């Protein structure tokens, strides 16, 4: 309803874009930074795409200097290939600082698009834990599910009750956005899935094994990304678990994963 006081998303972006261009033109960096920091990463990505190369680099550099996390999240939304071209002008040690704050699958998406010598230098400069996580994903062949999965996937033991599962979920730091709750055995084999809604509706003493679905769609780490995208489209999934050759849960691909479902 045009009279309800809200503004359509595309109109908000148009207003933001006009303001960015105006503030850049008059050199009002402080005001420009304030405006950029109020934007959602996806909106910033659209703004980046509408600016000239020079203005885009200027806005990005300003944001990187003051709010690097927001800048990097916007670049992930912007697309790895375009974003890597913007980042390639920065020194490896600085890129390492920015990239190591991202989830490893996001970092891999950007590092994959950097020139080989620069990506190698970046990996050397990253913290051991961060570079190790990234290098583990880089070991998977390009165009495979393993290459784009997020290895930080929350899983529940099949021995839990619904109440215990809810407690585990509340106490986990790995959970960003839960679409499905995957259930594993003591050796981390993927054995089932349960929705959060289902978990909340049953009695707390109900065993997970009684309410989980054992017939679930998954991808192997070596599954081609196009096949993954087709599964997601065919079954209307928000996320898909990734397993290794022993059917152990290795990661997850969501519709938030960079370039994951671009083929759908």
Where are these regions (language model features)?
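Hydrophobic packing positions in regular secondary-structure scaffolds
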Residues: 1-264
């Amino acid at each position: 309803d045009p009279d309800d006081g809200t503004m359509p998303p595309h109109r908000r972006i148009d207003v933001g874009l006009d303001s960015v261009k105006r503030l850049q033109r008059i050199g009002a960096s402080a005001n420009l930074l304030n405006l950029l920091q109020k934007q959602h990463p996806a909106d910033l990505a659209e703004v980046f795409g509408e600016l000239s190369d020079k203005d885009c680099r200027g806005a990005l550099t300003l944001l990187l200097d003051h709010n690097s996390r927001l800048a990097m999240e916007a670049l992930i939304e912007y697309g790895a290939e375009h974003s890597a071209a913007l980042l390639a002008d920065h020194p490896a040690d600085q890129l390492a600082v920015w990239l190591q704050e991202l989830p490893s699958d996001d970092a891999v998406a950007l590092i994959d698009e950097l020139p080989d010598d620069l990506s190698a230098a970046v990996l050397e400069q990253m913290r051991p834990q961060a570079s190790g996580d990234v290098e583990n994903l880089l070991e998977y062949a390009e165009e495979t599910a393993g290459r784009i999965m997020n290895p930080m996937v929350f899983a529940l033991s099949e021995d839990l009750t619904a109440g215990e599962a809810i407690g585990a979920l509340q106490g986990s730091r790995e959970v960003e956005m839960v679409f499905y709750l995957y259930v594993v055995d003591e050796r981390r084999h993927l054995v089932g899935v349960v929705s959060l809604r289902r978990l909340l509706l049953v009695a707390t003493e109900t065993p997970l094994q009684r309410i989980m679905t054992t017939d679930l769609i998954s991808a192997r780490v070596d599954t081609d990304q196009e096949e993954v995208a087709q599964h997601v489209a065919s079954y209307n999934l928000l996320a898909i678990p990734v397993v290794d050759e022993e059917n152990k849960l290795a990661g997850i691909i969501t519709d938030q994963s960079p370039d994951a479902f671009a083929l759908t």
